Amino acid sequence: MSANSGVKRASKAFKTCLFCKRSHVVCDKQRPCSRCVKRDIAHLCREDDIAVPNEMPSQHESSPNDNNIQGKYANKAHTGIPSDYQNEPVNKSGSTYGEELSPKLDSSLVNDTTSLLLPQQPVFVSENVGSEFSSLNEFLSMLENPLLTQTSLSSSSASNVHLENGSQTTQSPLEYQNDNRRDEIGVARQENRSPTIMSGSSNSISKGDKQDQEKEESRILANANENSAPTPKEQFFLTAADPSTEMTPEHRLKLVINAKLEAGLLKPYNYAKGYARLQDYMDKYMNQSSKQRILKPLSTIRPAFRTIARSLKDVDLVLVEESFERMLLSYDRVFTSMSMPACLCRRTGEIYRANKEFASLVDCTVDDLRDGKLAIYELMTEESAVNFWEKYGSIAFDKGQKAVLTSCSLRTKDGIRKRPCCFSFTIRRDRYNIPICIVGNFIPLS
């Protein structure tokens, strides 16, 4: 090389060789340079012949080739279509700046330009790459989560609208990957929400099923109660309240007593409680002489009653109570048809039936005169009560006498007023000749 060329190479643009320039190091002025000699490429060491211009050409002074190249790359960068510059022959007539390129630099410059312009674009990539996998993932997610079906349908309908309007846009591979990532994130969020939604819906479904099951069970129980036969106690009340007149009174009495016996309400009466009640009343409201007069006849008849009762079995005592119930039912009809004050009481004095005339006479209700709530001696004066028990004791075991006519003085329930009456009572006996009840009739004297 000439000296003039060495002087020219003293400038900064031609100071280094081609390989030192690529490595961004400063080489010496010897050719081949010491660095290329060490790398065993002394035969390739040469200077870079590309002259660096002082000014870059302006935008308006760019060549038509530059405009074509820039337009091509800009268009392909926006559309996402892979560049086909590698299939086109390289124009060797001029460089980008209007200078000739050596054949050895063509491929390197083209590769450098390609790496700078399209660093992230794959070569020969179709715009539909991965679409089949995306469709498959979307289909599987729809099968696993039915809640996403509506979302996918709405998105597909929106895409159909864009296609019909002719506004189809082309996505680059990078944008396509970002969209797929966003779709996967949305699906993951929806799947995270779906267990809560499904658990809430399952809880509501389980609660609804439980409520329906409870309603069904209550309905079945109600139907069973309606269809089931009444209990023995209910059957007794239904039979006793039946106003049927098609059967004879004897047959009706038999039905009522049998129903009460089956209900367990027909039991032997404990007369010891009745005598204890009488004893308490005498201790509270009677003097000693009156008590002795009452206890004298009772001391005679009570041992006789006790002796007979001990010889009887429980079945016999139940039959005695059955006969008493028969008398109660028969006297209900009798008391309703008569206008004379009357009542029916046990041999211990507890009143079990009475008519409304007797209730008005002693100033109380008919219900107060039922089932032993009041006793006959509690509605009499002290002298009248003593007279009653003496008369009763005298004929209790006398089969030839069963009725007594005498006088008494009744008093109201509150004990304020007195009602003098003509009094007659009749003793009814059972099959064992034991007094079972006392029926009294009263005629007021004033």
From Swiss-Prot:
Phosphorylated by SNF1 in absence of glucose. The phosphorylation is required for induction of transcription of gluconeogenic genes. PROSITE patterns: ZN2_CY6_FUNGAL_1 (PS00463), ZN2_CY6_FUNGAL_2 (PS50048). InterPro entries: PAS-like_dom_sf, PAS_13, Zinc_cluster_trans_reg, Zn2-C6_fun-type_DNA-bd_sf, Zn2Cys6_DnaBD. The keyword Transcription applies. The modification Phosphothreonine is found at T231. Residues 15-45 bind DNA. This is Regulator of drug sensitivity 2. It comes from Saccharomyces cerevisiae (strain ATCC 204508 / S288c).
